[in-house]
Amino acid sequence: MKKTITTLLLLLLSLRMTGQIDYLEPIKDYSKYKSELSGYYSNVLSLLSTGLSKKPYACYAVIPSFSPEYTVSAETKNGKYYLISNTLSQNSWQAEKSTIKVNTKSTEISKTLYQALGELLQMATLQIQDMDGSTTGLDGTTYYFSTTNGKGEVLTGKKWSPDRATLMGRLVQIYESVYALSTGKAIPESLIINDARILLKDLQERSKAFPDEYKQPKYAGIFPAGLW
């Protein structure tokens, strides 16, 4: 009997971790919880947001299980447009905040790229799908996307280790290229702009075809991991 129950639990966990729900998912307010986990999120988000706008236009943050966390944000200053990235010197889960260094890099970009990144996140965060459970696994990487809407509200959605072929997987790939560009990698802006525009069009077409799909809560398993 115990073996049967264990097998069923493992099967449910496997299905939850491999199933793909192709929308960004909501986040929880970590500040309302008192635990080691909430302390971790408070520390890591504080470090990652160093020097970045409180009202993000297009911000991407990555929290892996074991490697250093990092973020990149599209910013504007004095009429110019920049990508600013913060990369932590080590994974902050087991580290004291005072021992972690923030490596900041910046690169100037075109207004066209800046706008393409913002338009993409405006669309992606318009359709955050409520979840019954969590698709976040014990290992892997969680990706966060933030933007500010016309009302001045910061909208943030997350995705855990999406398949590369999905819409959210493509969103992650685009922003991975954005992060790489911010750190000095030779990635053509035109490539990122083109990919962003194609994905934006695909998201818009899905929205027209299935306008209310994201409003339907999806069951995502019985093993929620983490506040976020």
Please state what every model-predicted region is.
Residues 1-23:
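Bacterial Sec-dependent N-terminal signal peptides
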